[in-house]
């Protein structure tokens, strides 16, 4: 049957929860290039645990830059921000420093989430230094180190009633869900 876009008044995280209902928590949701599969249940759990920690450092409705590789961590971070009413802005690390700086201005972004391992492996030290000026840079490794048993317990409880928790924090279906950048006619990135 054809997809009814007009009837799809949902958020990213609500769509994830619908997929969990449809396919089950144990079903593999995604597998990254390192061959690390993650189930729908673990994706939701991780999103609640990480999202709650990131929500404590950001504002509801805030656009938060993601400078991450296309791996599990990106999906967990994106859905975690979405679960708590933040707007992930996907930064393309191959765009170059000038375009990334322009993207950060256009969005506008005051917070960037990244990974030390990614910055090191992709040799992006100068890029993160340049785009991080005047912005808070949150490293996922630091967030992981700060996770307590309480954080994990609260995430597990949230995962038991995900719709209820999400409704308390979520943006509405008419609010921005994600910011993607495309090169503009003058070559400067435009947020869509």
Where are the predicted features?
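Conserved pre-ATP/AMP-binding loop-to-beta segment of ANL
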Residues: 137-181, 188
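Helix N-cap/beta->alpha junction signal
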Residues: 68-70, 115-117, 175
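Structural core segment of the AMP-binding/adenylate-forming
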Residues: 56, 83-155
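AMP-dependent adenylate-forming
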Residues: 15-39, 177-179
